[in-house]
């Protein structure tokens, strides 16, 4: 933390030396600040089956701990001061309630939706000098491998420091320090069920788990984005997290990410070509015996897409992971893989010895006069071969659909409906038997931004 404290002093000195500022006084900076917010009403419902044993299954039964429904109502309020000598203060509070949830819903969604109360998710000091922007404190971060997800009612956040510079032509440089993480609920942060999350020195390491946070010491990251070549975007990022505790052992974790995105404009439509190579370097493990899982793995992925074809779009994505080890995609649930599905996301595709595929079909109804209405159909596969001497492996098949509507008559209001059915076929190698369990989840989201 000495580094962060020194950075604050440096920013203060630099700010006072600058003659460029928006507000004349500190009082004006607060008076001229901007307030924005969002009202959310979300309803989730899921029905889940499971095997009676994860290592020696003999039958499929209903997973009562992961079946139920929940209605959440949330208020998000954001306030950012006007600039004063280049400085700004920013805050965001998320207040959530689940007024009608029953015991079944509480249990089913305790990790990601059931957490009543409020959390100050952003509370930062920002400073801008030329083309350099810095933030210290609690803040939302969205980079390929440090990324707080907003797919649940409470958005994930980080506490630390970030700096972004765009002085180099067509290039963005970013560096960051992560001290703490805020998840989705108190349960997800390792605390008592049913409350709002807090900031703790534990985080989601996606690929190990999407719901359980693990203790860590500190984390650092650096990234570069370059757009020097027309229609081509190149991205690279590295992150290091110290003393990550999986419950089995405690090890440092290195995570790296590279990506190339190329868009080819043609007459009446666009073609997209995307490639991604990512990996994690660590001795961290989970599980025991022949079912131990290592995370010293890689994933290679590619995507071909067509868009803006009279409102239609389509994409085919494929990815493969290393044969012996799974991959840690990053910190936070926003660090998703290319073949993440609409509702159930990335976890199946990050396992060791897994080939995953996804097909997307989209349509924008504004092309036929219905502004704001969009749809998506999705089909996904994540097929896993046996890893070393593991007792089981599993194949996932996903069918998903979504419709979203930005209501033109009321600016700021949007509605979204998502559904996914996932079939999980588990092979038990001791007697070469197969068992299929289903998972169905429906999500409705109504949001009003002001």
What do these predicted regions represent?
Residues 130-134, 152-322, 327, 379, ...:
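Signature for the C-terminal beta-barrel architecture of outer-membrane proteins
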Residues 2-141, 164-166, 362-366, 375-377, ...:
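Beta-barrel outer-membrane channel/assembly domains of diderm bacteria
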Residues 60-65, 108-111, 146-149, 191, ...:
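Extracellular loop and loop/strand-boundary signature of outer-membrane beta-barrel proteins
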Residues 53-57, 106-109, 153-154, 190-196, ...:
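Flexible, surface-exposed loop regions and adjacent strand-edge segments
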Residues 312-404:
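C-terminal structural cap/anchor segments
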Residues 98-114, 168, 175, 180, ...:
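Outer-membrane pore/translocation modules
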Residues 57-58, 138-143, 202-203, 228-235, ...:
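Flexible, solvent-exposed coil segments and beta strand-coil junctions
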Residues 66-72, 113-122, 151-156, 213-217, ...:
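Transmembrane beta-barrel outer-membrane domains
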């Amino acid at each position: 933390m000495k580094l962060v404290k020194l950075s604050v002093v440096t920013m203060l000195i630099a700010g006072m030396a600058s003659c460029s500022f928006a507000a004349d006084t500190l009082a004006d900076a607060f008076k001229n600040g901007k307030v924005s917010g969002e009202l959310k009403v979300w309803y989730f419902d899921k029905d889940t089956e499971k095997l009676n044993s994860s290592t020696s299954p003999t039958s499929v039964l209903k997973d009562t701990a992961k079946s139920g429904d929940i209605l959440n109502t949330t208020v998000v309020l954001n306030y950012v001061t006007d600039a004063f000598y280049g400085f700004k203060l920013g805050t965001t509070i998320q207040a959530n309630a689940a007024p009608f949830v029953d015991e079944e819903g509480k249990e089913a969604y305790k990790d990601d939706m059931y957490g009543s109360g409020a959390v100050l998710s952003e509370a930062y000091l920002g400073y801008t000098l030329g083309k350099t922007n810095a933030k210290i404190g609690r803040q939302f971060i969205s980079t390929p491998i440090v990324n707080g997800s907003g797919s649940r009612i409470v958005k994930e956040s980080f506490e630390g420091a970030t700096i972004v510079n765009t002085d180099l032509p067509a290039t963005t440089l970013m560096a960051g320090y992560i001290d703490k993480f805020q998840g989705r609920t108190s349960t997800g942060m390792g605390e008592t069920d049913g409350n709002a999350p807090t900031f703790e020195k534990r985080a989601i390491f996606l690929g190990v788990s999407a719901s359980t946070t693990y203790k860590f010491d500190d984390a650092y990251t650096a990234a570069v984005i370059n757009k020097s070549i027309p229609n081509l975007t190149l991205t690279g990022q590295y992150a290091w997290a110290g003393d990550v505790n999986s419950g089995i052992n405690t090890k440092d974790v290195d995570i790296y990410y590279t990506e190339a995105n190329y868009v080819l404009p043609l007459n009446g439509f666009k073609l997209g070509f995307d490639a991604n190579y990512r990996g994690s370097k660590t001795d961290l493990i989970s599980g025991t015996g022949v079912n131990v899982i290592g995370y010293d793995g890689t994933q290679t992925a590619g995507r071909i897409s067509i868009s803006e074809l009279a409102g239609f779009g389509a994409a085919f994505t494929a990815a493969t992971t290393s044969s012996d080890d799974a991959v840690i995609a990053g910190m936070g649930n926003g660090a998703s893989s290319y073949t993440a599905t609409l509702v159930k996301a990335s976890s199946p595709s990050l396992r060791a010895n897994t080939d995953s595929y996804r097909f997307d079909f989209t349509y924008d109804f504004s092309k036929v006069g219905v502004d704001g209405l969009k749809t998506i159909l999705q089909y996904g596969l994540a097929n896993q071969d046996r890893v070393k001497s593991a007792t089981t492996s599993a194949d996932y098949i996903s069918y998903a659909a979504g419709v979203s509507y930005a209501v033109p008559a009321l600016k700021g209001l949007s509605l979204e409906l998502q559904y996914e059915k996932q079939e999980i076929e588990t092979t038990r190698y001791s007697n070469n038997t197969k068992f299929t369990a289903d998972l169905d989840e429906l999500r409705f989201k109504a949001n009003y931004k002001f």
